[in-house]
Amino acid sequence: MSRLLRVYVDGPHGLGKTTAASALASERGDAIYLPEPMSYWSGAGEDDLVARVYTAQHRMDRGEIDAREAAGVVLGAQLTMSTPYVALNGLIAPHIGEEPSPGNATPPDLILIFDRHPIASLLCYPLARYLTRCLPIESVLSLIALIPPTPPGTNLILGTAPAEDHLSRLVARGRPGELPDARMLRAIRYVYALLANTVKYLQSGGSWRADLGSEPPRLPLAPPEIGDPNNPGGHNTLLALIHGAGATRGCAAMTSWTLDLLADRLRSMNMFTVDYSAPPEACVAQMRNLLPSMQCTVTPKPESHRAVADAALAFMREMSNCK
């Protein structure tokens, strides 16, 4: 049996998480870095998936297409973008095992550093597009329902940077297909801040049914920055945002079932934060210093270590040869 550490580095695009995560993996002989499947996203269809989403938003804003047509494009793109993550998650799930007993500080034999978790394409970015009026809440609920169960030892690193610095970084990187959209950036920062609040709320024993279920829906307050130590109430979470949006569309039962599923998926995640306003090497150091606090798992079978490593390497290989 071996020890496996899984680290999911996630957050709004343009923060510098990819630079830090890949640098952390490259300095360790026991780590595999799994990048965003950009080659898959650019080869799965007639055009780049990222460009497809931004173009749909831009054309809808200009009145060239209506909201229904834009939603169809965005829903299809988000679903396709989630496929590599969800498929890999299902492949390695039988080999993850359980967390060791408390106090056992044996270091991991293998570290997987993922550039994003499935919730990015099935929860966070769809909700941001809902806020920019490019995706109806019914479509968001459909995607949330596809979020896979959270295995033991799921470590999620979120992070933030000042809004003005974030926008300038996004403009400077000039990723193909990506448009510098300040409104979308505000929306995705808002969603990830609410995500951090949601995990804290659930892990403190919060129940959306008790705190939100009997009250009129309302939009969450402006959330604090990710990493705020205060414990948020239920009204300042993704659960409140989705609860309010679903209730206004007359789909209360479906919304409730989906919120139960989402709470189950998020409650057991081990969440950490990085301050990306620091220089790149300092961001790497922050991630490095977080590793000893993370939860690993003990693989259930002798062959599990090799199966997980082979799957990770195949992910990297296939994602770069899918056009």
UniProtKB/Swiss-Prot annotation:
Listed binding positions for substrate are: Y54, Q78, R175
Keyword tags: ATP-binding, DNA synthesis, Early protein, Kinase, Nucleotide-binding, Transferase
InterPro entries reported in the protein's UniProt record: Herpes_TK, P-loop_NTPase
Q: Which reaction does it catalyse?
A: thymidine + ATP = dTMP + ADP + H(+)
The GO terms this record gives for MF are:
ATP binding; thymidine kinase activity
Q: Where does ATP bind?
A: G11, P12, H13, G14, L15, G16, K17, T18, R169
The protein's superkingdom reads: Viruses
Active-site residues, as the UniProt record annotates them: E36 (proton acceptor)
Name one process (GO BP) from the record. DNA biosynthetic process
Pfam families the record matches: Herpes_TK
UniProt function note? Catalyzes the transfer of the gamma-phospho group of ATP to thymidine to generate dTMP in the salvage pathway of pyrimidine synthesis. The dTMP serves as a substrate for DNA polymerase during viral DNA replication. Allows the virus to be reactivated and to grow in non-proliferative cells lacking a high concentration of phosphorylated nucleic acid precursors.
- Subunit field text: Homodimer.
Name of the featured protein: Thymidine kinase
